[in-house]
């Protein structure tokens, strides 16, 4: 019959070092730590097999299809410098293995069962190359950076936000008051915390109403367009869309979603709704560290960031480099560029394993949030540039005089940094002087500078190259 039963080495079929990758292939870079005694070729081939067409034994039905056409192939293996028995295995997947426009299906294949595979001690997906042939099947972000700036009429500077704290426990009316004070003081956005959905102390509909009132009142007073990220995340997709519909009916400019806990299917549905109805979409990455914080196992955040750009979102949290949460500078800037730019060159020093061409898929604004305050403003302005959202939760609400003065302090600091940069000053070197000079003209900023003059969160990053 030509069918030979039994178990054979994966590497006989799935390790193909001579393979020349196609422009339509999805390419993956895995950090593979094999069990002792398992050769790297076998481990790399096993990853390619188990995440595509393979199973543990030869099966009769293999003969009914063309495996050569559909199989994943491990086409290159390189040892990781400084690590014993660890390799970067490159795998190419034919495009036909994936459903069009479905991040869910892409991840089910590439990071599915294979991560529980016994022959591997650990496995981490470091990067994915999404070919234009596949990215073109996605809508992507509902609006993108340029359209958002046009909607908000704000140019030439980062946008300012603030997460309303305490994150849980406020009534809807008091929550709306906090939103109003921040927006009136000079912020562009305020934000629902990611855990605020619809709890007994504050149901979603009440919150939406009071926040809408805060938005329109502060807009009328300041003459600027304002927004509040209304968290539409819910227990079912239907409920989530219902909340987004209500936000649109109130005239709110932006809604929010927790894309990892909510799931990619829900996120893509919401992104489609947002584009059809002119809502911006803010994405929070709650749960990302469960997946991306271990260096040897899981998935790097740059992969989750690429997946979000496909699934759809106009903002996404991307670490701060300087605040209280994980993030190394070069690596963070690597995935920040992957979110914003049309074309990103391969650059291993920034953790970018593949050249990525997004072919005019709209960009996503990175959001810096978590333990940042006015003294960080020069560094943030320099590191993230204009196309970003800088979010100060405690750094606004913790101001000794209250929310509105806290917002004023942040806005004055930001405008001072942008002006200094435009005049050609070096923010990295002169940052503290720039803030000090500005605080002479702004008592609010001076008070903020005094409160946070010594606060730092300095720990070694877990996830290095």
From Swiss-Prot:
Highest taxon above the source species: Eukaryota
Cofactor(s), by name: Mg(2+)
Record text on cofactor binding: Binds 1 Mg(2+) ion per subunit.
InterPro entries to which the protein is assigned, alphabetical: RuBisCO, RuBisCo_large_chain_AS, RuBisCO_lsu_C, RuBisCO_lsu_C_sf, RuBisCO_lsu_fd_N, RuBisCO_lsu_N_sf, RuBisCO_lsuI
Disulfide bond among keywords: yes
GO CC, any one term: chloroplast
Residues forming the catalytic site: 165, 284
Chief site of localization: plastid
Key words of the record: Calvin cycle, Carbon dioxide fixation, Chloroplast, Disulfide bond, Lyase, Magnesium, Metal-binding, Methylation, Monooxygenase, Oxidoreductase, Photorespiration, Photosynthesis, Plastid
Modified residues (N6-carboxylysine): 191
Gene Ontology molecular functions: magnesium ion binding; monooxygenase activity; ribulose-bisphosphate carboxylase activity
Xref: Pfam families: RuBisCO_large, RuBisCO_large_N
Site (Transition state stabilizer): 324
Binding-site residues, Mg(2+): 191, 193-194
Top-level EC class: lyase
EC nos: 4.1.1.39
Catalytic reaction equation(s): 2 (2R)-3-phosphoglycerate + 2 H(+) = D-ribulose 1,5-bisphosphate + CO2 + H2O; D-ribulose 1,5-bisphosphate + O2 = 2-phosphoglycolate + (2R)-3-phosphoglycerate + 2 H(+)
PROSITE patterns: RUBISCO_LARGE
Gene3D superfamilies: Ribulose bisphosphate carboxylase, large subunit, C-terminal domain, RuBisCO large subunit, N-terminal domain
Protein family: Belongs to the RuBisCO large chain family. Type I subfamily.
Function: RuBisCO catalyzes two reactions: the carboxylation of D-ribulose 1,5-bisphosphate, the primary event in carbon dioxide fixation, as well as the oxidative fragmentation of the pentose substrate in the photorespiration process. Both reactions occur simultaneously and in competition at the same active site.
Subunit structure, as described in the record: Heterohexadecamer of 8 large chains and 8 small chains; disulfide-linked. The disulfide link is formed within the large subunit homodimers.
Protein name listed in UniProt: Ribulose bisphosphate carboxylase large chain
Lineage start: Eukaryota, Viridiplantae, Streptophyta, Embryophyta, Tracheophyta
Gene: rbcL
């Amino acid at each position: 019959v030509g069918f030979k039963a039994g178990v054979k080495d994966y590497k006989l079929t799935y390790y193909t070092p001579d393979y020349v990758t196609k422009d339509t292939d999805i390419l993956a870079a895995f950090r593979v730590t094999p069990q002792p005694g398992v050769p790297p070729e076998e481990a790399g081939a096993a990853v390619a097999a188990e995440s595509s067409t393979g199973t543990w034994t030869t099966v009769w039905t293999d003969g009914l299809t063309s495996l050569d056409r559909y199989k994943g192939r491990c086409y290159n293996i390189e040892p990781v410098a400084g690590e014993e028995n660890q390799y970067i295995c490159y795998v190419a997947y034919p495009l036909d293995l994936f459903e069009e426009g479905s991040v869910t299906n892409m991840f089910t294949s590439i990071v599915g069962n294979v991560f529980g595979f016994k022959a591997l001690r650990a496995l981490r997906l470091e990067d994915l190359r999404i070919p234009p042939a596949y990215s073109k099947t996605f809508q992507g972000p509902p609006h993108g950076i340029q359209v958002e700036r046009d909607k908000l009429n704000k140019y030439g500077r980062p946008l300012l936000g603030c997460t309303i704290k305490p994150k849980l426990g406020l009534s809807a009316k008091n929550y709306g008051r906090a939103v109003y004070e921040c927006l009136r003081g000079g912020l562009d956005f305020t934000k629902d915390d990611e855990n605020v959905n619809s709890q007994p102390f504050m149901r979603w509909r009440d919150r939406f109403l009071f926040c809408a009132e805060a938005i329109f009142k502060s807009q009328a007073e300041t003459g600027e367009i304002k927004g509040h990220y209304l968290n539409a995340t819910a227990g079912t997709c239907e409920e989530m869309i219902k909340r987004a519909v209500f936000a649109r009916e109130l005239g709110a400019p932006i809604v929010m979603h927790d894309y990892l806990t909510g799931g990619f299917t829900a996120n893509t549905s919401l992104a489609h709704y947002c584009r059809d109805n002119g809502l911006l979409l803010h994405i929070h990455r709650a749960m990302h560290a469960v997946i991306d914080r271990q260096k040897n196992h899981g998935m790097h955040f740059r992969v989750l960031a690429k997946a979000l750009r496909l699934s759809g979102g106009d903002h996404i949290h991307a670490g701060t480099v300087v605040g209280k949460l994980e993030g190394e500078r070069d690596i963070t800037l690597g995935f920040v560029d992957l979110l914003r730019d049309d074309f990103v060159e391969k650059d291993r020093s920034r953790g970018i394993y593949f050249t990525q061409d997004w072919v005019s898929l709209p960009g996503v604004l990175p959001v810096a949030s978590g333990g940042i305050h006015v003294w960080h403003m020069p560094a943030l302005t320099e590191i993230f540039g204009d196309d970003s959202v800088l979010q100060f939760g405690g750094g606004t609400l913790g101001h000794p005089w209250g929310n509105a003065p806290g917002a004023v302090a942040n806005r004055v600091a930001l405008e001072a940094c942008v002006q200094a940069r435009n005049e050609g000053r070096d923010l990295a070197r002169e940052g503290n002087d720039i803030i000090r000079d500005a605080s002479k003209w702004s008592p609010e900023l001076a008070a903020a500078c005094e409160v946070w003059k010594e606060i730092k969160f300095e720990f070694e990053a877990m996830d290095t190259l």
